[in-house]
Amino acid sequence: MNGNDANDEKEPMRRLRLGQPRTGKSFALGALGIGVFCLAMAAPVASGDWPQFRGPNSDGAILPSEISASSSGGNRRAAVTALDGPTTFDRGLTIGWKVDLPGRGPSSPIVVGGKVIVTASSGVRQDLLHVLAFDAADGHLLWQRQFWATGRTITHPQTANAAPTPTTDGNKIFAFFSSNDLVALDLDGSLLWYRGLAQDFPHLGNDVGMSSSPLVVGDTVVVQSESQGESFVAGIDTVDGTTRWQLERERAATWTSPALLPNGKEMAVLVESAKTISAIDPATGIVLWTHQQDCETISSACASGGLVFVPGKGMTALRVGAGSAEPVPAWTNNQLQCGAASPTVLGNRLYAINRGGVLMTADPASGKILSRTRLDGNFWSSPVAAKNRLFAVNFEGVGQLVEISRDGSSGKVVDKIPFGETMQASPAVAGGAVFVRGDGHLWKLVAGTEK
Amino acid sequence: MTSKIFTVVMLAVLVGASGLSAATNETELSAVLASIKQVGTKGAGHRAAQAAWQKLADADAAQLPAILVALDDASPLAANWLRGATEAIVARRLADGGSLPTAALEEFLADRRHAPRSRRLAYEWLVRVDQTTADRLLPGMLDDPSLELRRDAVAQLIVQASAKGKQDPDAAKAILQTALQSARDLDQINDAIRKLGDLGVKIDLTSQLGFVTHWKVVGPFDNAGGRGFAVAYPPEKSVDLAATYPGKSGEVHWVEAEASDEMGHVDLNRALGTHKGAAAYAFAEFDSDAARPVELRLGSANASKIWLNGKPLEEAEVYHAFTTMDQYIGRGECKRGKNRILVKLCQNEQTEDWAAEWKFQLRVCDPTGGALEQQEKNP
């Protein structure tokens, strides 16, 4: 045995399925006619920012940098203005830069104000937490802040303390960690406040590792932390870090992340546990509705077009109304399964990657599977989609660009990009570039030349 | 106005009254540091700390040693506020081409009365401005209270041993044995043992880590619905190795159980049979030549409780959420002579294959994680 104490490494990860090319190499992703899509802007982030896990809508849909999101009431949800148009990806992608990271982390990069924000954890006990800001233009390190974890730092070796993706309201950054440390910084790295939520909840923690990524809506950071010891969802004041509201939750582990749900002119937040999905008013913590529903505890729900897509024994779509009206099931398809990757929805296409690495393209209105495309490897990273193309990065660190036919009836991998290291983070897309993060590096992909 | 509120307000007034230049007086700095150090849980004190933090972050680098001193007794939350400010100070100073107060930082680092985290921070700053720091200072840090400093010192020795290699195996052995004696992290311990093995020196990993390998165990007791975790079955009241108890499905009595691998794992399924919704107890004794702080370090995927000499040290009602060495640490005091360890291990009723595990490992350590010199007793 030789002292290897990674006990039962495979077993917990069966339950927790998370989510070197060099500069100048063109990957020539081919023509990517990115359409203009219905996109939500939950916070006053600038057009072209990628403010949180799975992007502006928390649904994996790419906000084309060419398109300015138009305000639509309080939720700033942009309107669909076109279905075809030029995009920054039309000429393929080339490595813009690649930089070293000081630690590991499945957390995804976010982009705000021309800065790429990344979290990492390091040290043999994973107790050193890093928040880094890189210049999106040239990749140079703008600032780095380090903190000592105040909660449990044990995780399965596959994941790391820096698993949750940070979030931003456009002015402030909120970085969350498996150890339940929540740090607020301004865009220059100045500390605004620091919360150690495990100091408030001593039994909080999961030694598999926690991964729920927070969201900002208005002046509230919504944090979901659910474990066998203690569980809660809380709204934290973005200004001073105090708790605005707090909801006790079932004491059971979940790794899903809150997602945005348009609610009239406001924005609600979806939170899941194994048997329920709820919509919460982020300003008050009032539960708008709770629906009994089998939910996966790793892949997260997302919302689009009045439907909420919930991974759980396949996929279920819930039709939501305004306010606190409980949603009504629209369809269930037990073949439309998600593995660790969360579903992506874009216009009239719904994508799910199952545990076998098969990408399923479905009609979000009916749940009908239109095509199945086998990808290489397994996926912990959630894909991003633009028009009829989808970009997914497998665990081994191979990016795969998939083109789906217009009618959705077929798909094919049109390019592969080997990054050469393990990848669990989801891509971020902003300012006409794609940012991907692996166990040791951060890459920027920029427009290149077409093959 | 309560005195606490008054204090915070006065601190805020002082903080807002002046900057923190190199010539800042001690009172001003103390006020700033106090404003930050009063942060509490649930966001308490953040407003006052925010104003103070900006002042502190703007301070001159000459103030760094004083801030490190403040870190010594700061709460874990306040420590991060202070650390954030020091990083802003250091980054600005170095970006401006300035220097750090190296003599004062080195003096601070040398004083082991300061908190390990503060000293580690001083060391990292010194490394950034003086490339000789590691070679000069690490050799004296093999027994450092800071596990990070100790780790770097051990790593330096392992590199030295590798350089000696087969050219001078006796020197390499000596260096590796010193490294092994100081190492506290499993990867370094394994590395040193493997390299010593290559040189013909066999080290027993189990003893090196301090695992208890001989146990008496009893069970199953009822834990249906997880309710047995809170039930104090007879062994929690007193351990009588000759006793029999009413168990989950009949009378139970203490039986022998041995660790089945070099990492000290004791398999309760093997010792007691496979059960679901069950609780068991494991008992062992060890001798200590003196009363001293001790840590009972448990690894188990089952819900657990730990007692030392009848005193509860630690509990975790968590099932099958990964396990690793030193997962739960019970801190206490052992006494001179015989000490009694009792562990409760609860199995739940999950039916998945991976939830069949009902086992544990436990080692007896000093507060650095080194194996306590002990004579394990067969109870």
Model-derived segments and spans:
Chain A
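Bacterial N-terminal signal peptides
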Residues: 30-42
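Noncatalytic, solvent-exposed loop/strand surfaces
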Residues: 42-451
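Compositionally biased, low-hydrophobicity segments enriched in charged and small polar residues
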Residues: 25-28, 32-33, 393
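Compositionally biased, intrinsically disordered low-complexity regions enriched in proline and serine
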Residues: 5-8, 21, 38, 51-54, ...
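Intrinsic disorder/low-complexity segments
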Residues: 23-24, 34, 69, 84
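N-terminal secretory signal peptides that target proteins for export/translocation
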Residues: 1-27
